[in-house]
Amino acid sequence: NKGLNPGMVVXLVVASFLLIFFVGNYALYXYAQKTLPPKKKKPVSKKKLKKEKLKQGVSAPGE
């Protein structure tokens, strides 16, 4: 028994990287929310949204 097998090590490394990545993103997001002034968006009607989507084709979600 030589301690952990390589598969476990790889999985642990990947898992820890993902964890760090998500925690880092969350921290940055919270930090940005505090420091940046909130952008005031004009309310867009649903008809306009539909027209914009039709014009652009199907745009990336979250834009």
Curated annotation (Swiss-Prot):
- The protein's predominant localisation is nucleus
What biological process terms from GO does the record include? regulation of DNA-templated transcription
Disulphide bridges in this chain?
none
* Spans annotated as Disordered: 38-63
Q: Which domain of life is it from?
A: Eukaryota
Q: Name one GO cellular component term.
A: nucleus
Q: Which keywords describe this protein according to UniProt?
A: DNA-binding, Nucleus, Repressor, Transcription, Transcription regulation
Pfam families cross-referenced by the UniProt entry: S1FA (PF04689)
Query: Biased-composition ranges for Basic residues?
Result: 38-53
Query: Nuclear localization signal: where is this motif?
Result: 37-42
**What GO molecular function annotations does the UniProt record carry, in alphabetical order?**
DNA binding
Record localization? Nucleus
Q: Which family does it belong to?
A: Belongs to the S1FA transcription factor family.
What's the stated role of this polypeptide?
A: DNA-binding protein that specifically recognizes a negative element (S1F) within the RPS1 promoter.
Name recorded for this polypeptide? DNA-binding protein S1FA
Q: What is the lineage of its organism?
A: Eukaryota, Viridiplantae, Streptophyta, Embryophyta, Tracheophyta
